[in-house]
């Protein structure tokens, strides 16, 4: 029997390995999307919070000085940053539902 026939007679020897690789790739992609989402949230949420508070909320509706508006907007941005970090840490610590690591041999 030649090596060509042995490979043909062997069946799907590579199929479980390929399926396992696709499963790992899917998990890696899911992890990448999660980390990218939280990175963007941590970067953009405080910036958006600062400018929304400064431009639309505090300047429009409250009659306070410019310095106090900037300080209040900065405090709001710091609070938003802590909320985003807290969400990331909570997700990293407790994990997503169904994301338990399973060992396969």
UniProtKB/Swiss-Prot annotation:
Highest rank taxon of the organism: Eukaryota
Pfam families: VMA21
Region entry Disordered, spans: 1-26
Coiled-coil positions: none
Chief site of localization: endoplasmic reticulum
Keyword Coiled coil in annotation: no
InterPro entries in the record: Vma21 (IPR019013)
One CC-aspect GO term: endoplasmic reticulum-Golgi intermediate compartment membrane
Keywords assigned: Cytoplasmic vesicle, Endoplasmic reticulum, Membrane, Transmembrane, Transmembrane helix
Lineage of the organism: Eukaryota, Metazoa, Ecdysozoa, Arthropoda, Hexapoda
Signal peptide interval: none
Similarity field: Belongs to the VMA21 family.
Native organism: Drosophila yakuba
Regions of this protein lying in the Lumenal compartment: 58-68
Lipid bilayer topology: Multi-pass membrane protein
Residue ranges annotated as Cytoplasmic topological domain: 1-36, 90-105
Protein name: Vacuolar ATPase assembly integral membrane protein VMA21 homolog
């Amino acid at each position: 029997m030649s090596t060509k026939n042995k490979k043909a007679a062997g069946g799907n020897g590579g199929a479980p390995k390929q399926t396992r690789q696709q499963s790992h790739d899917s998990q890696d992609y899911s992890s990448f999307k999660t980390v990218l989402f939280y990175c963007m949230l941590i970067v953009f949420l405080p910036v958006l919070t600062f400018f929304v508070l400064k431009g639309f909320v505090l300047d429009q509706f409250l009659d306070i000085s410019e310095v106090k508006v900037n300080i209040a907007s900065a405090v709001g941005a710091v609070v938003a940053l802590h909320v985003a970090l807290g969400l990331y840490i909570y997700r990293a610590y407790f994990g997503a539902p169904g994301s338990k690591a399973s060992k396969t041999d």
